[in-house]
Amino acid sequence: MSALTLFHGTLLINVLCLITSAETKLAALVKSQVYEPESAVPASIDCSLLPKMSLLIALYKEKDIAATLIANLGKIIYPPTHLQVIVVLEADDLQTAAAILETELPAWIEILRILAGTIKTKQRALNYALRICSREIVGVYDAEDAPEPDQLLKVAAQYATASQDKDCLQESLSFFNARTSYISRCFAIEYSAKFRVFLPGLAKLECIIPLGGTTLFLRRTIL
């Protein structure tokens, strides 16, 4: 095969991929024209009927934002008896641990110090935390997340109306500092298009949904 033929073949594949991507996004756009907002929180809630949730948050060298994270978690509206929050720390991350211990930790927040290892990744930390998860729904947050206070109630409402084969829920993300700079505005527009247009459209097309690494909720039974 000549170099020219290989080039033309590669070029054709790339063009076809671009066309397919554009067609998929166009189809998702059309399908998502009628945007369905997330499930509303009922006016009155029977707390005993809410699913029990575990939230996993892996931190590494996050001392500057640790106190803000704990404060944001403290604003969550959900029965403490139905909530388990596990903050995972690496064994050598003493500064983040000290920053967290200086805060007033709610009783439903647990600190898990994992064994020292040469590899320090979010996946490894979450796998450690998963071993002690005891709730029906497992959620994943990042250190910089600032969930709306009623977000878990909305998650519970969506699971309550979903069929049993719906095991995963990706909540929408947005930037809280969208107006800070031109770059933050661009990111905010990108996230808005992705989570309010593209992903809802893919869901209606019954396509595979790409999941993010945060604000993600799964049934414990599938993990």
Report the location of each language-model feature:
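Cell-envelope/extracellular polymer assembly enzymes that use nucleotide-activated donors
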Residues: 51-54, 84-86
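Short aromatic/hydrophobic "clamp" motif used to bind/position activated sugar donors
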Residues: 138
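N-terminal membrane-anchoring/stem segments of glycan-assembly enzymes
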Residues: 1-47
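Long helical/loop segments within the catalytic core of UDP-sugar-dependent glycosyltransferases
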Residues: 104-105, 113-131, 135, 149-223
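A conserved hydrophobic helix/loop-capping motif in glycosyltransferases and polysaccharide synthases
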Residues: 54-62
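Acidic donor-binding segment of Leloir-type glycosyltransferases
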Residues: 74-117
